[in-house]
Amino acid sequence: MAKTQSPLQWLATTIIRGYQLLISPMLGPRCRFNPTCSHYAIEAIRLHGFVKGCWFAAKRILRCHPLHPGGEDPVPNKKHRCDK
């Protein structure tokens, strides 16, 4: 069963998809990570919710610069309160 998105999650993922479809092709490949920062952001928002997902995405975007080596960086799994 698919998880229902909140309106903020829908808005954020729609804006990111717009960037992927309209702006990113003009800029060319720039991201140092796999998955790309925009795909990471969408996955983080879907998995962790709007606030925490945007926080993960912002931290990731701040790491995406020429001085960082990049590489594999998947979205962290969602931790439950009972997990330690």
From Swiss-Prot:
Entries under SMART domains matching the protein: Haemolytic
Q: Which UniProt keywords apply?
A: Cell inner membrane, Cell membrane, Membrane
Q: Give Gene Ontology CC terms.
A: plasma membrane
Pfam families found in the cross-reference section: YidD
**Which chain positions lie within coiled-coil regions?**
none
UniProt membrane topology term: Peripheral membrane protein
Localization, UniProt: Cell inner membrane
Described purpose of this protein according to its UniProt entry: Could be involved in insertion of integral membrane proteins into the membrane.
Its family remark reads: Belongs to the UPF0161 family.
Name under which the protein is recorded? Putative membrane protein insertion efficiency factor
Organism, per UniProt?
Answer: Shewanella halifaxensis (strain HAW-EB4)
